[in-house]
């Protein structure tokens, strides 16, 4: 975005998680801002072209106008080449563990392999949410349901329930953290009572991982209320609700164990123990522009 010359924002709030340092956000860009709420237009970023209305009608109208243009798409070639260059220079990568420990990135890769990339995936908020975005390569739209920048811990499990009820023939997977799952853990009872076939995979790192990462990087490791010294045994907790549950600790068997869980009839909870101190990158430090992201 830092090098964009035009940004078309659809329902965006331009909050600080997107912009970083506001007065240095996309300095060369013109902004088209579409929102149903006029109060959001130009609230944080001045809109050069404000459009107030429902995207359900606005986007088809804009698409019709765009397709009527005889645009020279070859003009995009240098820009696309530049993007490919960035991908080669800054690939998503991580240092895999030398033993059988499960890295959180690998957990998502394993889940992608186990599901064949065909599941509807819901997620909560935190590191696991970012890793789902990076390592579960969604082949088509409307496959990932999350609360985005709203930061709604506890969203993932109810969203998975709704997705499964709405799309009963689709495989539905909830990826959550050991913090987020406890925000709405009572909905395990809903899954069992109504026999809603969702598969829940807890990325268990023993902490509120995203907050811990911020305190590590920006608060001199002054940790406060982020490590879970006492957490429930999630397998026993799920079983107490009458749900089948598995614990996964070995990366060499992870894909097969995930496949077995996915093939188990009815709702299932999987407690996946991942390396506890892994950080998710890249990220924008507080008060910094996007071009100076960490990692």
What function would you assign to each model-found segment?
Residues 72, 84-89, 97-100, 286-295:
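Conserved acidic/glycine
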Residues 1-79, 258:
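Glycine-rich, acidic loop regions that bind phosphate or pyrophosphate groups
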Residues 74-81, 124-125, 271:
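Short coil/turn segments at secondary-structure boundaries
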